[in-house]
Design a protein with these regions (language model features):
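RecB-family 4Fe-4S metal-dependent nuclease core
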Residues: 1-271
Length: 271
């Protein structure tokens, strides 16, 4: 495993924990990470797509718990998330588009359980919505925690534990996205720290993304496995190491290759 340069001065610890989302932002642009996670200056406040994603995630948990009237419950979840949006964002929503999104969610949810059975065969539900808040112990004298949120954990008769992360999208992902290192590191890190939390052998854990596709005409729920061996785990932990070291060191370089779609572009925070 990678070894971190020791930083024992607690004053340097600007973050007591780090999540995959924060790591992904840092990898995109360290300066953007500083603005959001150090300065607490978050410009993006959500939109129709994020509201839909949160509502679908909540409804998936209800499906797995055997709830009835799931379409009505999803509609309630979706309405709640829409109402929680910034007022300006909410008032700019197009009602026809909102109705379309709601219908698409209602079409996806009845397919969840059948898709899991087709993909895994026999399985037992272990956990839903599980929090991770585990110490990063790979590096001596480096007291930090990794924070995560696992959507679903299943067990199969072969003794395997399966971690699943729901991803809402339009038509799906290209193969390039499915194989992208920073994307798959989410599940790699979840596997690593889940194994630590429950003191189980990582080799008995498999990880999967489940794509929930709004606009696809078929295969609206697509599951695929993400492999995470020792090499990939080490690579993910090395990136985590690099991020935390540079955050503590105050190295907030701007990645100008990531400026085009950044919400801070040409603002007073990043002129």
């Amino acid at each position: 495993l990678p070894r971190l340069v020791k930083i024992n001065n607690s004053k340097n610890r600007l973050l007591e924990h780090i999540s995959y989302s924060a790591l992904k932002v840092w990898n995109e642009c360290p300066h953007k990470h500083k603005l959001i996670y150090i300065d607490r200056n978050k410009r993006f406040v959500g939109n129709l797509h994020t509201a839909f994603g949160k509502a679908v995630h909540d409804a998936c948990e209800l499906v797995l718990r055997g709830a009835s009237d799931i379409e009505d419950k999803f509609a309630s979840c979706f309405e709640k998330e829409l109402m929680a949006l910034d007022k300006e964002v909410f008032h700019e929503l197009d009602q026809e588009t909102v109705t379309e999104f709601e219908q698409q969610g209602k079409e996806i949810l009845p397919l969840i359980m059948g898709s899991l059975k087709d993909y895994f065969g026999d399985f037992t539900l272990s956990r839903t919505e599980e929090d991770l808040f585990e110490r990063i112990t790979e590096y001596e004298d480096y007291d930090r925690r990794f924070k995560g949120y696992i959507d679903l954990v299943l067990n199969t008769p072969d003794g395997k534990t399966h971690i699943i992360d729901w991803k809402t999208c339009s038509w799906g992902w290209k193969q390039e996205r499915k194989n992208e290192a920073i994307t798959t590191y989410q599940l790699t890190l979840y596997k690593h720290f889940y194994a630590r939390k429950h003191n189980i052998d990582p080799d008995t854990i498999e990880t999967h993304f489940a794509l929930l596709k709004r606009t696809a005409n078929k295969n609206k729920v697509e599951l695929f496995r993400v492999s995470s061996g020792n090499k990939k785990t080490n690579n993910a932990l090395t990136l985590l190491d690099k991020a935390l070291y540079n955050i503590d060191s105050g190295n907030y370089l701007k990645n100008k290759l990531s400026c085009n779609y950044c919400e801070f572009r040409k603002t007073e925070d990043c002129p």
